Every structure is written in C-alpha cells, then in structure tokens.
Amino acid sequence: AMDELWSSKAPVSCIHPGWESLSGREDVVESWRSIIRGGAPAIRCREPEVFLYGNTATVLCYEEVEGDFLIATNVFVREAAAWKMVHHQAGPTRGKPQDDPASEENPQVN
C-alpha cells in the first residue's frame, strides 16, 4: 500500500519524528516498510486541512497515535488520475484536535 501512495515520477522526501531527513523514493518507501514491519501502532488522521494549488496539494492534520498527537504535513502531486505523496513530515505538537465526532470517521493511515 505504501508503494502505491508515493509518487514514482516526482522526487520524494520524508521526515519521521526523531529521524533524519530521507530523500529518494527507495529510502522513503523502505522506511515506511520498516515502521510497519515493526508492529507500528494505528495512526489516525484527524482534522485534515487541504490546500489545493493546481496539480499540487498540501494536507495539514493531526496524527493520533495511541492517544498522543503529532502534527503532520503531507504534500501530494497529481499523476495522471491519482494524487501521489511527495513529502511527509510529522512531529510533536502541544495542540490536539477538538473532539469532533465526525473525525472518528477519518480513515486510518496504516
């Protein structure tokens, strides 16, 4: 699933919390495989905000991980008929999403 999410045409990058910056599709996708293989906890996207700039979109959201929250930025580009991720960055935040019953319907990231 992670392989399908990331762009195969544009340069990609990722900064996981506490990690150094990763560049290049192979390193980024392998980092996610490693996280998932390690029994990564469920991550839920909460309160996403989408900013559309033609064939590029930025999504800001909270990531809920075992009751704690990170703040994340995800950047997507349009490739043919699909949106593909080109950048992900998540880190600690003091904030947290408002209790919104609709946010429970947001899809799980992994």
Locate the predicted segments by residue.
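A beta-strand edge to alpha-helix "cap/lid" segment located at domain peripheries
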Residues: 7, 12-110
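Solenoid-repeat scaffolds in large eukaryotic assemblies
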Residues: 1-2
